[in-house]
């Protein structure tokens, strides 16, 4: 088992280094100009070249032209709207569905205030935020998968 040595903030040498701005990384290099002039352009150019290479090597396929006289049986939204679509589809009262959608960001806004007494960065030491995140992710995936299924089996995903 390893023991992590915590810095002694009463040490005058360490305090002098921190006062000079040398505490942001192990080597004591300042962010300007090292990171901003050399590392960031390399990362940006690398990202742009990867995106350009993918666009050239695997262009997007053009689908069949739209027919305004043929309506599909069920019109589905884009994939990122599947959980919201499923929520509105399964709740009988549409006002309740809209209120449930508004409750999601309202609930997420309350989590920092609930966890404000806890200063830890480790997610396992912040049980409320971790639990809210995990339950929200599972519910969003469940609703998203259910939106692609017929309405009668959409909540159970055909499992029960």
UniProtKB/Swiss-Prot annotation:
**Which residue ranges run through the membrane?**
36-56, 95-115, 131-151
Q: Please name the SUPFAM superfamilies in this protein's record.
A: a domain/subunit of cytochrome bc1 complex (Ubiquinol-cytochrome c reductase)
Membrane protein topology class: Multi-pass membrane protein
Q: Does the keyword Transmembrane helix apply?
A: yes
Q: What would be the name of the gene that encodes this protein?
A: petD
Q: What is this protein called?
A: Cytochrome b6-f complex subunit 4
Q: Which Pfam families does the record cross-reference, listed alphabetically?
A: Cytochrom_B_C
Indicate where this protein resides in the cell.
Plastid, Chloroplast thylakoid membrane
Known HAMAP family for this protein? Cytb6_f_subIV (MF_01344)
Instruction: Show the disulfide pairing.
Output: none
Record's GO cellular component terms:
chloroplast thylakoid membrane
């Amino acid at each position: 088992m390893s023991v992590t040595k915590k810095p002694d903030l009463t040490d005058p040498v360490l305090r002098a280094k921190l006062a000079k701005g040398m505490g942001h990384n192990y080597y004591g290099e300042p962010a300007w100009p090292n990171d901003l002039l050399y590392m960031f352009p390399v990362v940006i150019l690398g990202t742009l070249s990867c995106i350009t290479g993918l666009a050239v090597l695997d262009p997007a396929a053009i689908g069949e032209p739209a027919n305004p006289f043929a309506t599909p049986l069920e019109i589905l939204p884009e994939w990122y709207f599947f959980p919201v679509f499923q929520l509105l589809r399964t709740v009988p009262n549409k006002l309740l569905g809209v209120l449930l959608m508004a409750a999601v960001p309202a609930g997420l806004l309350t989590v920092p205030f609930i966890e404000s007494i806890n200063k830890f960065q480790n997610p396992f030491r912040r049980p409320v935020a971790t639990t809210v995140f995990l339950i929200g992710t599972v519910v969003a995936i469940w609703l998203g998968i259910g939106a692609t299924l017929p309405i009668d089996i959409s909540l159970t995903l055909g499992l029960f």
